[in-house]
């Protein structure tokens, strides 16, 4: 489709004329709508969520419940490889007794090594916190969708601080389940945490290595670590010092356990001040804007391209004008409704939209703040209706639904 050849501008209202081809309630508080553009080939699949319905809630999921989760595909990103697809996570969690009605792909990710480009919080658990250097260079991934325990929502930027307290002394750690614990890259940080999510053999023939030239402090809480929930008391169960000798890196399997990998002066100090059986305190704070309220769900996005009702274009013109399939999430000004919508593209039946065009769609949908998740061949939406779960959009990946890294589910409590 050529706007110019058709003497048509994406500034025109008529450019966004559509017809509603499907409109039905999937569950109480969840409405599905399918919009089909009239003047060119474009379909949009939207889910409207009533935020005043306390039975409708959000859940997030990491593929296979592990992180990192390598795909072993050299980032070719074609279809299903090793990691769970969205459909598989929705089906699995329904089988576990969770009434999942809708699912979408969320974060951008490195497919081969299997880590997201932004943070992932599930039921308060810091599943993935990337290191400060990566956070500082991925400036277009600083936003996200945060659903707090009190059911409020934020799209603001985030800031993480992790601390281990030994007596009155505090020691900062910088990441959770980040591949930085391989100790193979620069820059490095002298204390990084990993948990039961960091699995030694995530898939047959693939490993998640951990560098051994470090001090390993293994602790166990009486409950799983959560962000914005204060200090958790932990007991040191084991200390392994691999700085001067060959050791095997420890992996843990209990949800209450964690491993702090420490190097440098911090390791020198901790090895003197800690012994097995000692009590310590550990905390994880994730500030969203100015809020440190307890968090149920956080999924990192790419751009927040509608902010307080105003179009906020990506700074690079070529990014702003690139036409893509996309996955988006936005909220109305009165905060009564969230709309999740997928823009299809890269096929004969769907052109895709650029950021300005997506903004015009948001405006038409009545949205005041909007973020964009991963797009392209990752864009996918799944729904459950009349006993059947299925993908409802047209995935543009030539090999079908893709093994993404993490997903967002909409659940109705029963």
What are these regions (language model features)?
Residues 285-298:
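Short, Lys/Arg- and Gly-enriched loop/turn segments at beta-strand edges
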Residues 274-281:
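Loop/turn positions that initiate beta-strands
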Residues 235, 243, 252-256, 287, ...:
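Well-ordered beta-sheet/strand-loop patches within structured domains
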Residues 44, 142, 277, 326, ...:
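Extracellular structured ligand-interaction cores
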Residues 1-261:
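Zymogen propeptides
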Residues 259-273:
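Short alpha-helix capping/helix-loop boundary micro-motifs
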Residues 113-139, 147, 296-368, 373, ...:
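Conserved, well-ordered active-site substructure
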